[in-house]
A protein has these predicted regions:
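Short catalytic/signature loops enriched in Gly
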Residues: 18-21, 158-162, 252-348
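P-loop NTP-binding/switch modules centered on Walker-like glycine-rich loops
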Residues: 74, 193, 197-282
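ABC ATPase NBD coupling module
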Residues: 77-81, 93-109, 127, 135, ...
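Conserved ABC ATPase "signature" region
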Residues: 91-92, 142-162, 271-272
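Conserved ABC ATPase signature
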Residues: 166-171, 175
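A short, proline-enriched helix->beta-strand linker immediately N-terminal to the Walker B motif
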Residues: 186-190
């Protein structure tokens, strides 16, 4: 099988040694207990992030994006069966326990898509923000609060002392998400896992929050795994992007190429389904069928074949490997012959 970790990146950050990723996910498989049976939710997921790189995970709901992030952060539900390898800075994440796991979580921060679902309504903002500093890094309470006030200022929240005394319900959705970003950055992480951080916000607030997140990521030199269902947003934010479908990665390449020159029929269909405000009376293009979860998808053939207009008998013969294309990776046995046609689909 081709190694997704060799896929080209748009940039090699200064000081990053080629072949020395900060995060290396290799052959990750996750099965969860569903209706009394362990069913697959991730299948052979492999990718790596170089220091300072922004890497996107794109796909529809249920494709496995968030589950991948939770596996990296060791936040999978009880009873999960995990195989494969997750290496962070050369350490086996699955082997970490106790103090080692707490230290790891200080170096890997996560921003969730719904801030209200991940804050305690009866705890003040200050307690929430400083908890990781106090418990994982043994920072004194007064110093932790001072750092929190400073970080609130960096995400555009004034009067930080007053905000620390408030409760989550006293803040707007956009302001609370800024608090989540500030909290994630307080421990000076090396890796930021951003799980659709603007989904619950209105369009204007989304743009403001994304600008803050991208600016601070660049300022602090963070590596970021950015999860989204929006192909255009990934192209604007990320150096490289992996497209996921039914628990598998189906394409990895430079983000700027995903729309104009897709390698996989699913990527082309996603790009073609986007609304175009420049066209009037334009019927939205929908992908036939419905998105499948990993345990619903065919196990012995291409998972996208039931919805793919380009599927042939060869697509039903086996689960395709991620194939090298010279400028990326694609899980489609017809990539080379379809390339021009897929570009037309994306542009339609």
């Amino acid at each position: 099988m081709s190694d997704p970790r060799t896929a080209p990146a748009a940039v090699t950050p200064a000081g990053a040694a080629p072949g020395a990723p900060l995060l290396d996910v290799d052959g990750l498989n996750v099965r969860l207990p569903i209706d009394g049976i362990h069913r697959p939710v991730l299948r052979e997921v492999s990718f790596s992030l170089r220091p300072g790189e922004a890497f996107g995970l794109v796909g529809e709901s249920g494709s496995g994006k968030s589950m991948t992030a939770r596996a990296i952060d060791r936040l999978l539900p009880a009873g999960a069966q995990v195989t494969g390898s997750i290496q962070f800075d050369g350490q086996d994440v699955s082997a970490l326990t106790g103090a080692g796991l707490r230290q790891y979580r200080g170096r890997v921060a996560m921003i969730f898509q719904d801030p209200r679902a991940h804050t305690n309504p009866v705890r003040r903002i200050g307690d929430f923000m400083t908890e990781a500093l106090r418990t994982n890094m043994s920072v004194p309470a007064a110093e932790a609060r001072a750092r929190a006030v400073d970080m609130l200022g960096q995400v555009g929240i004034e009067d930080g002392e007053r905000r620390l005394r408030q409760y989550p319900h006293q803040l707007s959705g956009g302001m609370l998400q800024r608090v989540m970003i500030a909290t994630a950055l307080l421990t000076q992480p090396r890796l930021l896992l951003a799980d659709e951080p603007t989904t619950a916000l209105d369009v204007t607030t989304q743009a403001e929050v994304m600008a803050i997140l991208d600016d601070l990521r660049r300022e602090f030199g963070l590596t970021m795994l950015f999860i989204t269902h929006d192909l255009e947003l990934a192209a604007a934010i990320c150096d490289r992007t992996a497209v996921m479908y039914a628990g598998q990665i189906v394409e990895i390449r430079r983000s700027s190429l995903l729309h104009d020159d897709p390698l996989h029929p699913y990527t082309a269909a996603l790009a073609g389904a986007r609304p175009d405000i420049a066209q009037t009376a334009h019927r939205l293009r929908a992908i036939p069928g419905r998105p499948l979860s990993a345990f619903e998808a065919p196990q012995e053939e291409c998972a996208f074949a039931p919805r793919c207009p380009h599927a042939r008998d060869v697509c039903l013969a086996a689960v395709p490997d991620l194939l090298e294309t010279g400028d990326g990776l694609s899980r489609c046995v017809r990539t080379h012959e379809l390339r021009g046609k897929l570009q037309a689909v994306a542009d339609a």
